[in-house]
Amino acid sequence: MINILLCGNSKVFDGALTQLVSMTNRTTESIHCFLMTMNLTRLNQDFTGISAEQAAFLQEVLRRKNPENAVTLLDVTDLYEKEFGGCANEGAYCTPYTLLRLLADLIPEIPDKLLYLDIDIMIANDIRQLYEIDVTDYEYAAVKEKYGCWLIRPDYFNAGMLLFNMKRVRETKLLEKARELIRTKKMLFADQTAIFKATTKKKLISRIYNEQSKFDRKGTVVCHFCKRLLLLPYPRTENYKQWQIEEIHKYLKCYTFDSDLEEYLRLKAEFE
């Protein structure tokens, strides 16, 4: 069983569906997907939690692939408010939902090994290859951040993929320390920087497990459709997600996931 953690609000349904389709199309291993969500409409009317209907449909899709697959919906609204409500980092670079992974050690249902994935990720090969990496002596495994490893520190990582050893995380209080930083220190990339600063021991692994720019590389397992910095013909950023099919064809020249995305469109129409 591969244990996956996805976080977000009701707007991440497209990302979760595309990602899980690509994942389950490339593995025979059973998948247990934990969906961590919350309702935070006090900040934004769009910040509604992943619905029970959305979670149930995702589980139905997964079980068509493998009857042992499962989806567990975790509403952590009260826990979030207790830990982070009103803190300075609620207005972080993305949304407060980026902070949810920092609550994982407080959730009894979370197992000892857990693969956290950002919602803008697609899986290009068997996810088991990543999940079976040995992290016994580490808090987590991660891949260097494309820009941060040059601009911040050589070992600065991208938190869009984190293979957690939750047993060690609880022992070292990694996430507890990260939450304290979130409450007390304003940071630009709050969740990522808090984990980085709170780390005791991490394992840096190959970029094939969090490829952040070139999605046609042979052997790549995780393709991360994160924001990219382009310098030519003028400095700018580019941010196209996998469910924006026309855009990833036109601007990213990415056709790797066309069959998955065709399936996604059929499934989305079925859900609606």
Write out the residue ranges for each language-model feature.
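A glycosyltransferase accessory/donor-loop signature
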Residues: 1-11, 17-18, 27-29, 166-272
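A structural signal for isolated positions on well-ordered beta-strands in alpha/beta enzyme cores
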Residues: 3-5, 32-34, 72, 115
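Short internal beta-strands
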Residues: 32-39, 142
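Active-site-proximal specificity loops/subdomain of glycosyltransferases
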Residues: 41, 46-106
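A short acidic, often aromatic-flanked loop/helix-cap motif at beta-alpha or helix-coil junctions
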Residues: 76-85, 148-149, 210-215, 231
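GT-A fold catalytic core of metal-dependent nucleotide-sugar glycosyltransferases
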Residues: 77-79, 97-144, 154, 163-164
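Conserved catalytic core of nucleotide-sugar-dependent glycosyltransferases
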Residues: 127-184, 192
